[in-house]
Regions:
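Secreted/periplasmic carbohydrate-active enzymes, especially glycoside hydrolases
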Residues: 1-168
Length: 168
């Protein structure tokens, strides 16, 4: 029953324990940092303009500056916010697809917010000190499944291939 010729469940996958890819540990400020950040990049207006929805959890008195650069290094978005969620629009984006995987660089500047002087409310003077920068790669695309077909940016995609498990 359990000889070499019998079917073994998950025979196409070598189950290893431990870390299988490169891993990094980052030291961050305990009192002022980003605990979690997520973003969803999509397309609108006939796939011409991009949207980026950002949701974050921070601790401490933190403000975040978002800077989005295209491949050529041009700044296409610069915004600062202390809100937990933000939605930004980027005009005339390059679409990401399998043939042209165009990626933008999103830099998330974590800034400590400090009130300076005796002013209160809107009259208070605030200083921002950057305590860290977190980089991300962002691709603007819409992916959907319609029936049994996969669509990327309004174009049907035909997949060929088989399982692939990365084992060195």
């Amino acid at each position: 029953r359990l000889c070499d010729g019998t079917y073994c469940e998950d025979q196409d996958f070598w189950r290893l324990s431990g870390v299988a890819r490169q891993s990094y540990l980052y030291k961050r400020n305990k009192t002022t940092n980003v605990n979690d950040i997520r973003f969803i990049a999509g397309l609108k207006n006939d796939y011409k303009d991009g949207t980026i929805f950002i949701k974050k959890e921070t601790n401490g008195n933190v403000a975040i500056r978002y800077r989005l650069y295209d491949k050529e290094g041009n700044l296409v978005l610069d915004a600062t916010s202390a809100d937990k969620q933000n939605l930004y629009e980027v005009k005339n984006v390059h679409q990401w697809n399998a043939e042209n995987p165009y990626l933008y660089t999103l830099l998330v500047d974590v800034m400590r917010k400090e009130v300076v002087g005796k002013g209160k409310g809107k009259n208070a003077k605030v200083n921002y000190t950057t305590v860290g920068v977190i980089p991300f790669k962002v691709g603007f695309r819409n992916v959907s499944i319609q029936g049994s077909q996969v669509w990327v940016n309004g174009q049907h995609v035909f997949f060929k291939g088989a399982n692939r498990h990365e084992v060195d």
